[in-house]
Amino acid sequence: MLETLLQLRARTYDVAIVDLSLPDARGLDAVSHMRRAAPDTAIIVHSGHEDDGMALHALQLGAQDVLAKSRVTPPLLNRTIRFAVERKRTQQRLANLAHFDQLTGLANRTTLHDRVEHATSMARRRGDELALLYVDLDGFKKVNDTHGHEAGDALLRQVANRLRDVVRGCDTVARLGGDEFAILLEDTNGRPDIPAQRVVDTLGESFTLGDVTVSVSGSVGVAIYPAAGDTVEDLLRSADEAMYEAKVSGKGRMAIAAPVTRSSSTTRVRTLVPQSPVAPSPPVAMSTR
């Protein structure tokens, strides 16, 4: 079984057939091990017994089909393999729809929520900080209205690519909807303003959409865990409010949410202008929306 698992990890297979009668198959535990080793591979269980309970359990563990040896014929085996592969692909498409934005390929709001929740849990145990960036495009509506929705969609895809390029592979870039994005930054070394400024800078460069060149900018709000909130909702709210302050103070800027005072109805932010990303301007008081 170990050799099989190593092969599954080393190469990509469309389908794997596990024979439960083999000495090293270890029963249905083999399905669980294979599922973890090759999550993209369809699994067919080959059994010497027609047992509905066993078959149901195998499907619950991640198999795509169960085939009794007494009923195997070449046409049936061929059909079972084709159907198992197609079922696996359908499952993958549905999972993709549930967790990723279909226009940009970025994580969606649900996936972002899950990852921020996990990251804050880990940071709480380790005593670390992390940052959540809320990004809103300035001027997107004008592009959409002037050049059409296809151009707007193309712009959003290019924005997504640029956001991915300016952060690390371990960071999460998500599209929240419309022209709003979020970025989860883990292990920021106390300087989330540096990657946030890179976001402002890259969005300030012009975009080429076919024969048209357009210019937009990005307003970025930064919420630092745990100072600006200790739940996903609190961090999103703080980052959103900081983004709003950056937008009303001139657009194409970033603002960092100051520590939340639980007994206060206001959130304080300090605004950092693009020309001086490491020199904060005086704090600005902002009422919670």
Residue ranges with predicted function:
Residues M1-V15:
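Acidic, metal-coordinating helix/loop segments flanking the phosphotransfer/catalytic sites
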Residues L28-D29, H49-L67, R71:
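Alpha4 helix (beta4-alpha4-beta5 surface) of REC/receiver domains from two-component response regulators
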Residues T90-A107, S121:
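Amphipathic HAMP/coiled-coil signal-transducing linker helices
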Residues L76-K88, R115, A119, A242:
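Receiver (REC) domain switch/output surface
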Residues L6, L28-D40, H57:
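Short amphipathic alpha-helix used as the core "switch/output" element in two-component signaling
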Residues N108-A131, D138-R168, A174-G178, A182-E186, ...:
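Conserved long alpha-helical elements within nucleotide-processing catalytic cores of c-di-GMP signaling
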Residues A68, V173, R198, T208, ...:
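Cyclic nucleotide signaling catalytic output domains
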